[in-house]
Amino acid sequence: MPFVNSVRGSFGSQGRFGFGSGLLISSTGGTITTAGSYRIHTFLIGQSGTNFTASGSGSVEYLIVAGGGGGGWGASSYDGNGGGGAGGYLSGTANVSGTSYAVTVGNSGTAGTKRTSGDGLGYGGNGGASSVFSFTAFGGGGGGTDSYNNNSGLTGGSGGGASCSGSSANNPQFSGAAGTVGQGNRGGNVLIGGGGPGGGGSGGGGAGSVGGDGTQNSNGGNGGSGLANSISGTSLFYAGGGAGSSWTNSGGTGGSSIGGNGAARVPAINGTAGTNNRGAGGGAGTSDYLSGQGGTGIVIIRYAI
């Protein structure tokens, strides 16, 4: 398991784990900035495959966030679909020596495409994994679609939300997909399947909470909340879930204002993408209104100077 010596949460002003000082000052890799008494290496998707090369031995802090899952999209009227799960979230400390460490940053999960009956294309895609040292954060799970066979989302760092098939009175409850222990949370559930128009899909899970549930004749479920972290020198939210969509009501709101919002027919709005470089999930689509892709991941390493 890649969670040894990892801590989920924020790095505040008292969280100076590093003792690197002058031993690490010549380290290379990523975009290098300073904030106060810290030197910070930031790796984004365009830098995937590059290395962090430590110039000496010391302790560093890290934040690893995978790519968020894309929102689900169906074709049928009345159906709300599931928001994408956030990318997996890991933070903690690691001891490094004077060597090079491969860094991978996860890409965004693709938005679900408008499916036709039985083609299986409506699911949002899973985000890509991010990794450094011996730790891997798994990509967020794609949001569920109104497939009428399995409306649940896909598993991932945080799981995708489920779709509500509001046009059929015989559809059962559907569960949000599971997240990875230590990295995220499950997607929301659909509490009532079918029985009338206006089913709301559930939100994708976030690093801070499960996705919001969807019900018949409801708004789409909100995306699960992300977690705030100040490792970059500024407190920012990462890994918020994407929101579910609704046919006759409002789409849900993305988690921590970084997850994508869910689509709705009234008012006519598309689902939106998760925020890039934050690993946020994409918002779900509904019928003629698009779903959003997930946000790209990020890896940040810092040490005291």
Short names for language-model regions:
Residues 2-305:
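Low-complexity, glycine/proline-biased repetitive segments and flexible coils/loops
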